[in-house]
């Protein structure tokens, strides 16, 4: 009898602690929120300044570091050369070195082509497409913001 009372209270306590942990996690996630277009453009400008100061090699390394200075909430930097080769990727570093010019999203949209074409014309976005959110691992609508800096296009996307 005593065992069942203790077991029941222990189970209830575990449920309560689990609930509280989930609630705190949710509050933290809600407080951090999604990055905004203004945040994305600021991160692009910060990366461009770093590129001018530190050069391509250090910038590509830092932008591909998942714990680096160019990761903010759900924002990360991707840098392409003018042909669509990934020079840096903050969320999926294994894409570095691959040419993704012909990559398409789940709706068959050639989003990298569109980003590079618009960047060549001096535009900064947005290009809308679908991509996997780095924190939730779910497919989501995304808007890419970008800036051409010399021979590179620095991009950062906001999830909707």
Predicted segment positions?
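N-terminal membrane-sensor/transducer module of prokaryotic signaling receptors
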Residues: 2, 13-17, 29-160
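Acidic, Ala/Val/Gly-enriched low-complexity intrinsically disordered segments
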Residues: 5-7
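Charged/polar low-complexity intrinsically disordered segments
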Residues: 9-11
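Bacterial N-terminal signal peptides
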Residues: 18-26
